[in-house]
Amino acid sequence: MDEHGRPLIDRQHPHDLFMQLAAVWRIALNDSTGFTLVGAPVGEPALGPVTFMHRPSAADNPTAPLGHHTFDSTHVSFGVVTAAVDRGRWSAEGSIFNGREPDEHRWDFDFGRLDSFSGRLWFRPAPEWELQVSSGHLTQPEELEPGNITRSTVSAAWLRGHGNDFSAATVGYGVNNKDHGTRNAVFVEGARHSGLNGIYGRFEAVQVETALLQTDAVVKGPAANVTDPVFAFTAGAVRDVLSGRGWEGGVGADVTFYRTPGELRSAYGKHPLSFHVFFRLRPPAGSMGRMWNMRMSQPMVGHTEMPMNHQMP
C-alpha cells in the first residue's frame, strides 16, 4: 500500500529515506583472518546478493527487478545485528534482524523485535568473481500478507575494469518458501560502460503471486495461486551529458518486453511492453569512490587479496 492506503499496481514503493545507519567494529584475529561485528538501527542482514542498486551490473538501470522481494528486499531492515568472519577468499556472516517490511511512511524508523535470522557464505575464486549462497527465516514480513518466509538465494557476480570503463554481470536464483506455497525467481543482468556511454540489460523469470498484480480485470480466486512465471527482458542505454564538481548527469532510455501467464492476460495482455526515458543525476562520490558491490559486513581491508568492491569514481 502507498501512503494514501491505495494498492501498488505495476510499480514498486519508494524506499525509506534512511536505508543504512550502522556502527561497524572490525578486528584482525591474525594476518589472514578478521572478525566483524555490525549493529544497525537500519541496514541489511546477511541475506541475498548485493542489493540491485549497488551492483555495477545494474547501476545504470533505473528499474527495480521484478524479483526484488525474492532476493534483496531485506536491505532496508529496521534493526540488524551481524557478525562475520573472513579468511582469505572466504567470508561467513550471520544476522539477527527485524524481518518486518517498512510501512508506507517513508520518513521514519519502523523498529521492531529482532525476530528473524539469516546466514550467508561468500567465496572469491578470482579477482573478478564473487559467489554467495544464503538463507534466512523472515517472521511476518508483510503486513497485508500474514505468514513467515524462508528465503534462500545463490548468485555469482563478475566485474572487470574500473572507473568509467568496466564490464559487469550478475546471475542469481532465489526462492521464497511461504506458509501457503513456494515462489521462485531467476535473473541475469549485465552492463558495459565505456567513457560517457553505457549499455545494460536484464532478463528475469519470476513466479509472481497474482494477488499482488490484481486489478479489477483480473479474476480473483484460483488465479491467486498461479505459479506460472512472468518473463521480462530489458535493454537500455545511457550517456553522460553533464559533469561538474563531482556531479554527473546522464540521459538514457530502455525498453522492456514481457510475457505474462494466462491468468494475467485479461489485464495485461500476452506480451506487454514498457519503456523509460530518463535523466540520471549522481552526487559527488567522495574520496572512496562509489564503492559498488559493498555490503555492510564487508571483510577487513587486506584480509582478502581479491576484493570485488572496486572504487568507481
Pin down the residues of each PLM region.
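Surface-exposed coil loops of outer-membrane beta-barrel proteins
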Residues: 1-122
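Repeated loop/turn-to-beta-strand initiation elements of outer-membrane beta-barrel proteins
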Residues: 31-35, 45, 85, 89-93, ...
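Outer-membrane beta-barrel "beta-signal"
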Residues: 235, 269-313
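Outer-membrane beta-barrel translocator/channel fold
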Residues: 1-19, 135-145, 166-188, 195-233
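Residues that define the transmembrane beta-barrel architecture of outer-membrane proteins
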Residues: 15-21, 75-81, 86-88, 113-117, ...
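Transmembrane beta-barrel strands of outer-membrane/channel proteins
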Residues: 37-41, 85, 96-98, 133-137, ...
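Sequence/structural signature of outer-membrane beta-barrel proteins
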Residues: 42-46, 65, 76, 97-108, ...
